[in-house]
């Protein structure tokens, strides 16, 4: 057991998404779309680490998106296909998928996933996603954590200024960030976690 897991066992913190039910996740999607004034009807949406497809399924019902999901679990993808027969689902490593896909997207979701990758890998992933976003498209990084927070024993938290530095390097991306607890409410969200929205503003 690593230090992060031990801390979570003692304090009950960590893995906030495990506390969230279907209704919570659907409300998060709705509030994020409202905040960015996004109309995704008929557009391609990619969920990297899609789990059982709760977010994609909600968007499919509400906005008739073209859903794409990537996950390592066969069982998760089986559930996705049951919910969305017309979806496109891949059992693949996220970086390997991003290396081969030719599809362009108007939203890419990375909720509770990016911290599983090293900081260098996170830079690579975001750069690859930027290349497959349409102009006006949004990368939603949920459950982001920083090294100075109570998540200092998390697998790979990022340093303060990480996203500002990325956007200074990649001028095609615009940054917006907010507290998940403030926006989504209901007390299930850790005040140290943020949602990061990176919008592609130019080629």
Regions found by a protein language model. Give the residues of each.
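A conserved beta-strand element that flanks and buttresses the S-adenosyl-L-methionine
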Residues: 109
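A short glycine-rich, Lys/Arg-flanked "PGG" loop and its adjoining helix->strand segment in the class I
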Residues: 123-135
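Conserved class I S-adenosyl-L-methionine
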Residues: 43-49
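A short glycine-leucine-enriched loop at secondary-structure breakpoints
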Residues: 102
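Short catalytic micro-motifs in class I SAM-dependent methyltransferases
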Residues: 112-113
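Class I (Rossmann-like) S-adenosyl-L-methionine-dependent methyltransferase catalytic domain
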Residues: 1-40, 52-99, 117-124, 138-203
């Amino acid at each position: 057991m690593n230090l992060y897991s031990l801390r979570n066992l003692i304090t009950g913190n960590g893995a906030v998404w495990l506390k969230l039910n279907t209704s919570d996740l659907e409300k998060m999607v709705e509030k994020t779309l409202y905040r960015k004034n996004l109309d995704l009807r008929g557009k391609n949406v990619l969920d990297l680490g899609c789990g059982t497809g709760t977010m994609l399924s909600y968007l499919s019902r509400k906005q008739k998106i073209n859903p794409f999901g990537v996950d390592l679990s066969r069982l998760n993808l089986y559930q996705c296909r049951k919910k969305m027969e017309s979806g496109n689902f891949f059992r693949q490593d996220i970086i390997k998928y991003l290396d081969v896909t030719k599809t362009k997207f108007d939203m890419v979701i990375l909720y509770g996933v990016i911290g599983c990758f090293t900081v260098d890998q996170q830079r690579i992933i975001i750069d690859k996603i930027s290349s497959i976003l349409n102009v006006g498209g949004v990368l939603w990084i949920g459950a982001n954590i920083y090294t100075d927070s109570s998540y200092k024993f998390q697998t790979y938290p990022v340093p303060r200024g990480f996203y500002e530095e990325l956007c200074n390097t990649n001028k095609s991306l615009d940054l917006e960030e907010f507290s998940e607890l403030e926006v989504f409410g209901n007390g299930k969200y850790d005040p140290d976690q943020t949602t990061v929205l990176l919008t592609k503003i130019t080629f």
